[in-house]
Amino acid sequence: MVTEQEVEAVGQTLVDPGQPLQARFRALFTLRGLGGPVAISWISRAFDDDSALLKHELAYCLGQMQDRRAIPVLLDVLRDTRQEPMVRHEAGEALGAIGDPEVLEILKQYSTDPVVEVAETCQLAVRRLEWLQQHGGESAVRGPYLSVDPAPPAEERDLGQLREALLDEARPLFDRYRAMFALRDAGGKEAALALAEGLRCGSALFRHEIGYVLGQMQHEAAVPQLAAALAQPTENPMVRHECAEALGAIARPACLAALRAHVADPERVVRESCEVALDMYEYETGSTFQYADGLERLRSPLS
């Protein structure tokens, strides 16, 4: 049983800028797992932080929780042009993940936002909400991953056809995302390599999602492409960030070398992502039971 005092202590860790970023991330994911209005309130309070990486992750977690009570704060973040593009983008995606049609018109409004990552995200969220309306809600068949995705996986099963759809930049972004998630769900080396080819496509939003799904797959075949994207200083920081976190999740020795090489990167979101990814690497290669260990750390402060 989790006490209110414990939830508050985890929340205090999240909102305390004096805490190491890794500890704040673990607190965030602990709150996400706990759920409920108190957890949402603590997560919402951290949107005035100066770390774009942390704020982006706050929005991501609120979307994954799929709790309507998070809609007002996510709308505020989407509307706030002082927030970094990657934060506003994640708020738009989170609104799509929650799946409530009440936000459809607002998402349509921001589908023409001057920030292209925000506009494309809201276009995808609109398509997702429309798809949910047409198909009577979420699919009853769950894939191998627990995440709430910006698009449902395509029904096509042929990897060659899916690769072709993924890389065809003339197709609607929503359809390419559907191919992306179908390849992820298929798993294996061929699917991972097909996805890794997407890191060369034109849309930064698309490339960043490729990095995300490769991190979910944790297939080492994609390590060279992820490391190359991370090492490219002209690549969009949002893409480099996802590639860093993917390398942390894959957790092979080559990943460790790539992350250490960029832990002092001049781009803040990249170096912070490498810090968090190194913490994830430690978790993946260690004996810790779970990453979201905020409660365990409270109960065993010496560990």
UniProtKB/Swiss-Prot annotation:
Known pathway: Protein modification; eIF5A hypusination
Cofactors (names): Fe(2+)
First and last residue of the signal peptide: none
Catalytic activity, as annotated: [eIF5A protein]-deoxyhypusine + AH2 + O2 = [eIF5A protein]-hypusine + A + H2O
EC number of this enzyme: 1.14.99.29
Source domain of life: Eukaryota
SMART domains the record matches: EZ_HEAT
Alphabetized Gene3D superfamilies for the sequence: Leucine-rich Repeat Variant (1.25.10.10)
Classification via InterPro entries: ARM-like (IPR011989), ARM-type_fold (IPR016024), Deoxyhypusine_hydroxylase (IPR027517), HEAT_type_2 (IPR021133), PBS_lyase_HEAT (IPR004155)
Record PTM N-acetylmethionine, positions in chain: 1
First-tier enzyme category under EC: oxidoreductase
Keywords attached to this entry: Acetylation, Hypusine biosynthesis, Iron, Metal-binding, Monooxygenase, Oxidoreductase, Repeat
Family of this protein: Belongs to the deoxyhypusine hydroxylase family.
Name of the molecule in the record: Deoxyhypusine hydroxylase
Biological source species: Bos taurus (Bovine)
Organismal lineage: Eukaryota, Metazoa, Chordata, Craniata, Vertebrata
